[in-house]
Design a protein with these regions (language model features):
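ATP-dependent carboxylate activation and anion-phosphoryl transfer catalytic cores
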Residues: 1-142
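Short glycine-rich anion-binding loops that position phosphate/pyrophosphate groups of nucleotides
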Residues: 47, 152-153, 218-222
């Protein structure tokens, strides 16, 4: 969705080269990291992963079964297997157990903290992300006040998110530093106190249901401790929260898609998506979420 064609082509070439060099027959799991324009291979495992059933559902092929037959000596050509690039978008959304453990911080790091995954599938990214959030038990708001507090290096990056949410009719509330950056960019923004600045503060606003969405990025041990109560209160109040800029922007696209209603958000059988892969022209895809709201 947000990776350009040249990088995707490079990923495909690297994958093919590694599979041939390592002599893997069957399934192979690769993990890539993209930093700017630099592509890194994190690991290669000659085995299946949890992504296999996700991919199988997304493209309508029994990937594990095909891999087993290939490992047993059959050839892909004889099985009639071809590469499928679906016109729809499938989003894998993690499910976290934070609500079951009192006092646990919801901030994410390099370690795995999810205990499950769900799929959202639609003709565009925003609708797919929205469906995935619903499946994970998260209901994105349609109107209200959004609280934003981001680290210094994210203050410019969050501006497209702010612009998109304001265009959708939301009001924006922020801590002083973030509010200054938002106002400097020409967007209206209300100021709310941090907890340490005295009441009424942001946690009071969350408890009073004055805020419907939280976007909070932070760095450093002290900043993480200071913002813990924000994340935890949002969780206990069942207020959607995102701890990355990309997550906030994805949420804005999802809300925009939900506003469109049917047919964008209408339930659709998985078999209908699979049937469309081999029948009829490929429909145009809406812009990826890094290209701005449409």
């Amino acid at each position: 969705v947000n990776i350009d064609a040249a990088v995707l082509a490079e990923i495909r070439q690297i994958t093919i080269a590694l599979a041939r060099e390592l002599g893997v027959v069957g399934l192979m799991n690769l993990q890539f990291a993209l930093q700017g324009r630099d592509l890194y291979v994190l690991e290669v495992n000659p085995r299946a992963s949890r992504t296999v059933p996700f991919v199988a559902k997304a493209i309508g092929l029994p990937v594990a079964k095909i891999a087993a037959r290939v490992a047993a000596g059959e050839r892909l050509a004889a099985l009639g297997v071809r590469e499928i690039i679906p016109p729809h978008v499938a989003v894998k959304v993690p499910v976290f157990p934070f609500a079951k453990f009192a006092g646990v911080d919801t901030i994410l790091g390099p370690e795995m903290r999810s205990t499950g995954e769900v799929m959202g599938i639609a003709d565009d990214f925003g609708a797919a992300f929205h469906k995935g959030q619903l499946a994970a038990g998260v209901r994105l708001p349609d109107a209200g006040a959004v609280f934003i507090s981001v680290r210094d290096e994210d203050k410019d990056l969050v501006l497209p998110v702010v612009a998109g949410l304001i265009a959708l009719g939301f009001t924006v509330t922020a801590t002083r530093g973030t509010a200054a950056a938002i106002r400097a960019a020409g967007h209206p923004c209300q100021v709310v106190n941090k907890v340490k600045e005295g009441r009424p503060h942001v946690v009071d606003a969350l408890v009073n249901r004055e805020i419907v969405l939280v976007i909070n990025t932070t760095i450093g041990a002290q900043a993480i401790r200071d913002s813990f109560s924000i994340r935890r209160t949002a969780l206990t109040q069942r207020i959607p929260y995102f701890t990355t800029i990309s997550g906030g922007l994805a949420a804005a696209h999802a809300i925009e898609a939900a506003r469109a209603g049917d047919p964008v958000m209408a339930p659709r059988a998985l078999q209908d998506y699979h049937h469309a892969l081999s029948d009829g022209p490929t429909p145009p895809r809406r812009p990826g979420y890094r290209q701005g709201l449409t």
